[in-house]
A protein has these predicted regions:
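A compositionally biased, intrinsically disordered/low-complexity signal enriched
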Residues: 61-64, 178
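Short beta-strand-to-loop capping motifs
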Residues: 40, 75-79, 143, 177-181
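Long compositionally biased, domain-poor regions of proteins
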Residues: 147-151, 158-163, 177-181, 185-187
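Positively charged, small/polar-rich N-terminal and surface patches that mediate targeting and assembly
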Residues: 1-35, 42-50, 57-59, 66-70, ...
Length: 208
């Protein structure tokens, strides 16, 4: 089994929690809870990680997804200690340290100011979160592995008054769309850069 991503979200922000609720097939997370997001290969191995966490702690699963190549697990609880213990149980099952995850690799990062009304309309058609108004600033991020998009979104919402438009945390890469005033987007972008840079892991030279 390969640990691809493992991130601890200390306090789920309202929009990010709400976004996860739209896709969660398990117990829905609430804002204010702590969460753990884990990406594993092969995907079917996610079942063993869920087993390890649930038998040792009082966390509950929001997502356990097996997709084409990878598995994604989201666990949460109000007790941050329980979530930390779930992380420890998963690492023990894998027989690895947290730093043996892949380090985040940013594949694309863009800030687009003064978005045209036609483009905002197209984005609003595909988004599952908040709306983007014409004239606002758009931030986009593509990160590898995909699981790191969750902590990027949560940190952005924690640090700036932005709208989470779309969040993709599984697949080949993670993707994030944010909208808001230019100054707030700049603050969110800086927060994302800082949190991703602080996640130590194995060298990551590709997007596979």
């Amino acid at each position: 089994m390969e640990l691809r991503a493992l991130t601890y979200l200390d306090v789920l922000q309202p929009q990010v929690a709400g976004f996860i609720q739209t896709v969660a097939q398990g117990m829905m997370p609430l804002d204010g809870q702590a969460a753990l997001v884990v990406e594993i290969a092969p995907g079917i191995a996610v079942n063993a990680l869920t087993d390890a966490a649930l038998k040792r702690t009082r966390v509950v699963p929001g997502m356990q997804i097996v997709e084409r190549a990878y598995g994604l697990l989201e666990l949460h609880a109000f007790d941050q200690g329980e979530v930390r213990q779930a992380s420890a149980a998963i690492l023990e099952r894998l027989g690895v340290a947290e730093t043996e995850r892949l380090a985040p690799r940013v594949l694309s990062r863009e800030i687009i100011t003064g978005v045209d009304a036609h483009q905002s309309a197209m984005i609003n058609r595909m988004r599952h979160g908040q709306m983007l108004a014409a004239g606002q600033t758009l931030y986009t991020l593509e990160v590898h592995p995909a699981g790191y998009a969750a902590i990027a979104a949560n940190e952005a919402e924690k640090r700036a008054a932005i709208s989470v438009l779309e969040l993709v945390t599984l697949g080949a890469v993670g993707r994030l769309w944010l909208g808001g005033d230019e100054e707030e987007i700049q603050q969110a972008a800086a927060a994302i850069d800082a949190v991703l840079a602080g996640l130590a892991g194995r060298p990551n030279g590709g997007n596979k």
